[in-house]
Amino acid sequence: RYITITPLGKKGYLISRLLIPVLFAAIVSFVLLSFCSVSGMSLWTTFIISILATILSVVAAMIILAYAGNKVEGMALAKVSALVMVGLIIPFVITDSIQYVFSFIPSFWVAKFLISNNYWFILPTIFLSGGLIYLLYNRYNAKI
């Protein structure tokens, strides 16, 4: 509630707390993946993975922002928001069609993209993440 009366306002708060760190993280992850990678991914694939990971980090941050009422709840939700990334291991562990039970998790499609290098797997990641961000942003707005 106090955010609305600060000079930044709600949008300024989100920009300062989400957008700036997200842009910095995208650049750093791209640089690190480019120079420290042992997988031999192309620069284009590395760029895409950096962007998708950044989008997933926004989803995780929005979970905390939308539902945490205080610092203790925020710390607990930080643990829960890590479940956004659990989809990354599913296609590597479960190789038959049962893996698609987890297709509602955006990170599942990032792993599918990494395995197959099929650019169509980027779209479900973007649409699912965008939908989650939209829902969580509306929850955040209703909370304030």
Predicted regions and their residues:
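Short helix-to-coil transition segments within interhelical loops
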Residues: Y2-K10
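Transmembrane helix segments
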Residues: V59-F108
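Terminal transmembrane helical anchor/hairpin motif
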Residues: G87-R139
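Alpha-helical transmembrane segments and their short interhelical loops
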Residues: K10-K11, I15-G69
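Internal alpha-helical transmembrane segments of multi-pass membrane proteins, especially GPCRs
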Residues: L14-L19, I48, E73-K79, I115, ...
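Residue-level recognition of pore/gate-forming positions within transmembrane alpha-helices
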Residues: P21, A53-T54, K79-L83, I126-G130
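Short cytosolic juxtamembrane segments of multi-pass membrane proteins
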Residues: Y140-I144
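Hydrophobic alpha-helical transmembrane segments of multipass membrane transporters and ion channels
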Residues: L23-V31, V80, W120, P124
